[in-house]
C-alpha cells in the first residue's frame, strides 16, 4: 500500500484505524482554532511592539509592519493547508518532507525539532511563567525551577488523559488570554492620544529611509506570528481535515493579525513614540500612561503574561509529542514513542518522555540558552517544507482536499518570507548557527541510518 493509497486516505479522513491502536479524530474546528491562536499569541507580543517600533521608526510604520507581517504569513498558511489536506495525518513538516521524496531530510527535521526546539521550548515557557510570578512575590530560584517542572507535569497529565479534555482547556485558556489583551485595546482606545502619532520620527528613518525601515519593522514581527502551523502536528486527530485545516490555519492568521495590529495601534497612541521605541516592556510601560491603572499596570501585565504563556505551554505539551509519535510509527524513532494509551487514546509515552526532557532542560538552563542557536536550522526547515509542495504536486497520488489559490505566487511568497527569516537569523549568530547545522547532520544521519536499516528489517519480516 502506498503512503497515500485510496484505502489509507479513506482511513485518514474518517479516522479508521490502519493497524493496531491509532489515534482517533476527536478535534473540531473551534478546538483546532484555539490551539492555533493559543500557540501563536505568546510572550513575544509583550516585547515585540517595542522592537518593531525601534526598527520601523514611526508610529504609522510600526502599525503597518504588523499588518504586512501578518499578511505575508497567509501564503505560508495556504501551503500548510494544502499539504495537511493532502496528507491528513500527524507529523507536520516530517510528513510533508517525507512525501516530497526525502526521508533523510524528513528525519533530520524531526530529529532537530525534538532535541533542540520542542523540549527546550517547554522549559523556556515554564521558567517564563515563574519569572512573571516572581514579579508578584519573591521566589527562591531553586523553588522556581520546581514550580516550572510542576507546570509541565500538570499539563502532561492533562493532555495524557484526554485529547478532548485538553482541547477544552486549550479553548478556555485561549479565551482567557485574549480577554486581558482586549481590555488593553479598549483602554488604549479610550486614552488614545493622536499627538503621539504626529511625533517626530526616530533616527532610523533618516538613516535608512522609510522603505528599509518598514522592511526592518516587518522582519521584527516575524516571531510574533509563528505558531499557527502547530495544528498540522495533529492533523490525524482533526475531524474533517479537508475543511477544518484551511479554515483554522487562515482564520487564526487573520485573528492574530487583527489582535496584534490593534495592540500596536493603541500602544503607539498611549505613550510618546521615542519612549516606546526604547522600551523593553512596551505593554507594561504603555499602561502606566493610563490614569486608571497607573502603578498597577505592572501587576496587570504580569498576570496577563502568565495566562498567555500558560496557554502556549499547554498547547506545546499537547501537539509537539505527535511529531515523535509519527516518526515512531514509521519505525524511524524510538519504538516506545509510537505507543497509544489503550484507554485515553493519546500518545502517552511520547508526551511523558518529551515532558521529562523539558523538565531536564529546566535544571540545565545554560544548555537551554545554547540550544537557541539551533533556530537557524529550524527556520531553514520551514523553508524546505514550503518548497516541498512543489515536489508533492508532481506525485501521481497527490490529491489534496484543498488547493492553494494562485499557487505559484503563494508558494513563492511563502518561501521568500521564510528565507528572509533565515537570513536575519543567520546575521544574528552566523557561526553558532552553522555549527548547530553541522551538529544536526553529524548526529542525525547516523541515527537515520540506524533506524532506516532497522525499518527495512522489520518490513522484510512482515
For each predicted feature, which ranges?
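Membrane-interface "cap" regions at the ends of multi-pass membrane proteins
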Residues: 1-50, 54-60, 73-78, 89-90, ...
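Helix-loop-helix junctions that connect adjacent transmembrane segments
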Residues: 18-24, 59, 63, 142-143, ...
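Flexible loop linkers connecting adjacent transmembrane helices
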Residues: 19-23, 56-63, 78-107, 129, ...
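Hydrophobic transmembrane alpha-helices that form the core helical bundles
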Residues: 48-54, 74-152, 157-160, 306-326, ...
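Alpha-helical transmembrane segments of multipass membrane proteins
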Residues: 70, 111, 132, 136, ...
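TM-loop-TM module centered on a large, flexible mid-protein loop between adjacent transmembrane helices
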Residues: 95-96, 102, 134-139, 204, ...
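Membrane-interface loop-to-helix entry segments
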Residues: 143-194, 208, 249-253, 374-384, ...
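C-terminal membrane-solvent junction of multi-pass transporters and transport-like membrane proteins
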Residues: 336-345, 382-433, 454-462
Amino acid at each position: 500500500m502506498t503512503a497515500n493509497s485510496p484505502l489509507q486516505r479513506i482511513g485518514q479522513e474518517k479516522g479508521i484505524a490502519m493497524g493496531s491502536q491509532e489515534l482517533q479524530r476527536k478535534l473540531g474546528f473551534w478546538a483546532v482554532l484555539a490551539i492555533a491562536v493559543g500557540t501563536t499569541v505568546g510572550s513575544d507580543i509583550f516585547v515585540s511592539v517595542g522592537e518593531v517600533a525601534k526598527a520601523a521608526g514611526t508610529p504609522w510604520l510600526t502599525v503597518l509592519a504588523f499588518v504586512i507581517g501578518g499578511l505575508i504569513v497567509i501564503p505560508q498558511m495556504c501551503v500548510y493547508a494544502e499539504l495537511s489536506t493532502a496528507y491528513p495525518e500527524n507529523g507536520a513538516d516530517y510528513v510533508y518532507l517525507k512525501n516530497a521524496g526525502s526521508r533523510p531530510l524528513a528525519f533530520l527535521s524531526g530529529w532537530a525539532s525534538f532535541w533542540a526546539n520542542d523540549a527546550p521550548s517547554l522549559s523556556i515557557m515554564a521558567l517564563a511563567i515563574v519569572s512573571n510570578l516572581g514579579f508578584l512575590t519573591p521566589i527562591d530560584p531553586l523553588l522556581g525551577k520546581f514550580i516550572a517542572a510542576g507546570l509541565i507535569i500538570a499539563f502532561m497529565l492533562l493532555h495524557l488523559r484526554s485529547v478532548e479534555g485538553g482541547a477544552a482547556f486549550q479553548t478556555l485558556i485561549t479565551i482567557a488570554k485574549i480577554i486581558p489583551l482586549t481590555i488593553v485595546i479598549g483602554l488604549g482606545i479610550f486614552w488614545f492620544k493622536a499627538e503621539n502619532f504626529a511625533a517626530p520620527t526616530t533616527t532610523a528613518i533618516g538613516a535608512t529611509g522609510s522603505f528599509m525601515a518598514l522592511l526592518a519593522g516587518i522582519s521584527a514581527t516575524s516571531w510574533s506570528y509563528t505558531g499557527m502551523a502547530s495544528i498540522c502536528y495533529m492533523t490525524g486527530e482533526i475531524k474533517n481535515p479537508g475543511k477544518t485545516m484551511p479554515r483554522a490555519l487562515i482564520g487564526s492568521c487573520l485573528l492574530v493579525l487583527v489582535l496584534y495590529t490593534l495592540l500596536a495601534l493603541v500602544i503607539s497612541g498611549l505613550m510618546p513614540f521615542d519612549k516606546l521605541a526604547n522600551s523593553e516592556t512596551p505593554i507594561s510601560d504603555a499602561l502606566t500612561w493610563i490614569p486608571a491603572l497607573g502603578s498597577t499596570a505592572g501587576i496587570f501585565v504580569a498576570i496577563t503574561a502568565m495566562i498567555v504563556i500558560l496557554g502556549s505551554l499547554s498547547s506545546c505539551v499537547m501537539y509537539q509529542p505527535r511529531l515523535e509519535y509519527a516518526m515512531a510509527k514509521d519505525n524511524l524513532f524510538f519504538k516506545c514513542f509510537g505507543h497509544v494509551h489503550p484507554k485515553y487514546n493519546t500518545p502517552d509515552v511520547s508526551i511523558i518522555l518529551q515532558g521529562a526532557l523539558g523538565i531536564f532542560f529546566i535544571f540545565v538552563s545554560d544548555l537551554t540558552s545554547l540550544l537557541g542557536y539551533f533556530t537557524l536550522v529550524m527556520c531553514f526547515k520551514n523553508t524546505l517544507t514550503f518548497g516541498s509542495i512543489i515536489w508533492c504536486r508532481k506525485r501521481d497520488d497527490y490529491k489534496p482536499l484543498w488547493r492553494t489559490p494562485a499557487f505559484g505566487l503563494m508558494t513563492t511568497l511563502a518561501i521568500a518570507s521564510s528565507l528572509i527569516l533565515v537570513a536575519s537569523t543567520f546575521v544574528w549568530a552566523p557561526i553558532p548557527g552553522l555549527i548547530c547545522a553541522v551538529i544536526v547532520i553529524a548526529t542525525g544521519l547516523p541515527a537515520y541510518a540506524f533506524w532506516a536499516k532497522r525499518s527495512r528489517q522489520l518490513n522484510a519480516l512482515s
